[in-house]
Design a protein with these regions (language model features):
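NTP/phosphate- and nucleic-acid-binding module
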Residues: 1-193
């Protein structure tokens, strides 16, 4: 009849619980997180000052797209950047995520350290996160045949066939190609972030 008698041992009394006092609901929550990999470098020969100078020389801020806040950017050269590129599917579609995972493996095979980000956050926020940790290039999977490659400092993007991305990024990171040469060889994406 919607009531239950419940004995509270610590109070040595009985309490009546009615159905009005209890509600059961099912909620779906979307959780997004940010991972942080802490590391400590403590060499004994004074390289800490050199690294500090590298950080100091490479850090700057630029206005966000809305102009209301400042975005932090580490302008590491691709040669010294610990992570060379990030790979994002533009939207959460199975085929884009499959292409992104495959591309990430190909980039690792050619010796480029990369991160893949399949979170559902906006592409602008994902770009800002990678700019903040000094990643020079971002690959956005928005098709199964071609992707956009974004250069961090200019925020310019070019459309590159998926099968050519590993070699193009490897050549950019090894300074065998310049960003200007890549822009002249591939279609520049207008109105890019």
């Amino acid at each position: 009849d919607g009531q239950v008698l419940f004995k509270v041992c610590t109070l040595d009394t009985e309490v009546q619980i009615t159905k009005n006092m209890v509600s059961i609901s099912k909620d779906v929550k979307k959780l997004t997180g940010r991972t942080f990999t802490p590391s400590v470098i403590e060499p004994s020969f004074g390289i800490g000052r050199i690294i500090y100078c590298l950080y100091e020389h490479s850090f700057y801020t630029r206005p966000s797209k809305s102009g209301e806040e400042q975005c932090n950017v580490f302008k590491f050269s691709p040669v010294v950047a610990p992570i060379k590129c990030t790979v994002f599917p533009l939207v959460q579609k199975k085929e884009y995520e499959t292409t992104a995972t495959s591309l990430s493996r190909q980039l690792t095979r050619v010796g480029l350290s990369c991160k893949i980000d399949t979170t559902g956050t906006s592409i602008g926020k994902r770009y800002a996160r990678t700019d903040e940790i000094g990643v020079p290039f971002a690959v956005t999977v928005d098709s199964e045949e071609t992707v956009t490659v974004r250069e961090r400092d200019s925020k310019e993007q070019v459309r590159v066939p998926v099968d050519l991305v590993p070699s193009v990024l490897k050549d950019l990171c090894d300074r065998l190609l310049t960003w200007e040469e890549v822009k002249s060889a591939y279609e520049v994406v207008q109105n890019a972030m």
